[in-house]
Amino acid sequence: VLVLMGALAWWMRAPWPRTALEWLHIGVSGVLVHGVYLGGVFIAIGHGLPAGVTAIVVGLQPVLTALGAGLLLGERVRPTQWAGLALGFVGVAMVVAHKVAASASGGMLLTMLLPALVALLAITAGTLYQKRFCHSFDLRTGSVIQLLPCLVVTGLAAYQFETLHVQWTGSFVFAMGWLVLVLSLGAVSLL
């Protein structure tokens, strides 16, 4: 994603932030939103927390962000917005309720849940941080700036905690293609 977004930014001559402070703020928001959030989600699932339970935990992000926006940014959340957030959360809960029940009956451990909670706090903090300190930036160059420190952070974490051995199976290649092309580039293009 980093290479593709960098090439796109260069090819389209996208504007880059002018000050080191802008780069720093965009980088910090990127580490929180991309590195810590996604890392926490994948670690939680890797430790055995079902994807549905992980989804319900990080599905609280809009609610926490709305609370934080009111408390930290002085934004007012209207009652209709709270109702929409509540309906969305209820919808997610209904879809994954059976998985939550199965995990709880199987003895859900804090070690499984903790990375998902860290991911929730990271995506919330990153969203609020970006709203507060990254007022406007080009999505092409901003994505590059957000992903550069993530490469360093996740690279160091992988070096420390992983085997660095990749099994190049068809399933792995398809999953990586989906994560890179559809989820990452697709999500950025929707912004």
Q: Can you describe what each PLM-predicted range is?
A:
Residues 15-16, 43-47, 96-109, 158-175:
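Membrane-interface helix termini and inter-helical loops of multi-pass transporters
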Residues 24, 28, 32, 60, ...:
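Hydrophobic residues within alpha-helical transmembrane segments
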Residues 19-21, 25, 55, 74-94, ...:
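Loop-to-transmembrane alpha-helix entry segments
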Residues 1-3, 33, 42-76, 81, ...:
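Specific alpha-helical transmembrane segments that line the substrate/conduction pathway
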Residues 1-36, 64, 121-126, 143-162, ...:
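Transmembrane alpha-helices of multi-pass small-molecule transport proteins
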Residues 2-5, 68, 77-99, 120-123, ...:
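Hydrophobic transmembrane alpha-helices of multi-pass small-molecule transport proteins
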Residues 10-58, 94, 180-191:
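Specific transmembrane alpha-helical segments of multi-pass solute transporters/efflux pumps
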Residues 38, 53-60, 127-152, 180-191:
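Helix-helix packing/entry segments at the starts of transmembrane helices
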